[in-house]
Amino acid sequence: MTGSLSEIKVRITSTQKTGKITSAMKMVSSAKLVKSEQAAKDFQIYASKIRQITTDLLHSDLRKGSSNPMLISRPIKKTAYIVITSDKGLVGAYNSTILKAVMDTIKDYHPKGDDYTIISIGGMGSDFFRARHIPVAFELRGLEDNPSFEEVNRIISKSVEMYKNELFDELYVCYSHHINSLTSQVRVEKMLPISDLDADEASEDNVANFELEPSREAILEQLLPQYAESLIYGAIIDAKTAEHAAGMTAMQTATDNADKVIEDLTKLYNRVRQAAITQEITEIVAGANALD
């Protein structure tokens, strides 16, 4: 009986240590989430501005049809998917839901298996695809908790350049969209060719206030790739925010589970201890009766 008490006590101590670790990790994820949400809000100011400027400059082109390759749909021979996952686990179902959505998309739209490629951001996704011999054009691992544009610029600009060079004909980003600390939504969004600019949102009055040099066309030649890059970067920031929220929720759940286990083990410990005391009393009484 004493051995059982010792074993239960060890399990309680071990679970308490685990609970302290998961509680600390939850607090870390919570702090990261706050920073990431603020970064996302700050980026939206830039994203809204570049979207408005791009739409205004394209005002006439959107209505009559632009010849810029960033806007023109061409026959689809190959599709690229930027898949954003985490580098580590302990984020609940964050990675599995994204990867399931990607695999479902591949199954539905690419039965031949040779008309798509993956651009992977995050080690979990890279390892998943390579283990299944799914083509990965290139990857990025070790992303910071709040990535700067400089950190991801190479993979973003490379993706846009590959599209311009017709190495693939459309580009999607697969990621988890952050809604709040408890909710996220997997999205598979088309980024190229650019199709989210609405001519009705354009204002010729805004363009009239611009001094365009050397020309509108020359500016758009530089601006459209930057706009596409901003869309991808925005998705990365959004995904990181969702990742931190998932990590915080997972660690809170783990802490709650640890508390429940400790509670159950403590009750078990008390029952076993009470049984041991009762057994000892019974033996003492029996011994005393034997002496009488």
UniProtKB/Swiss-Prot annotation:
One of its GO terms (molecular function) is proton-transporting ATP synthase activity, rotational mechanism. Its main location: membrane. One of its GO terms (biological process) is proton motive force-driven plasma membrane ATP synthesis. GO terms for cellular component: plasma membrane; proton-transporting ATP synthase complex. InterPro entries: ATP_synth_F1_ATPase_gsu, ATP_synth_F1_gsu, ATP_synth_F1_gsu_CS. Pfam families: ATP-synt. Gene3D superfamilies: 3.40.1380.10, ATP synthase, gamma subunit, helix hairpin domain. NCBIfam families: ATPsyn_F1gamma, PRK05621.2-1. Produces ATP from ADP in the presence of a proton gradient across the membrane. The gamma chain is believed to be important in regulating ATPase activity and the flow of protons through the CF(0) complex. This is ATP synthase gamma chain.
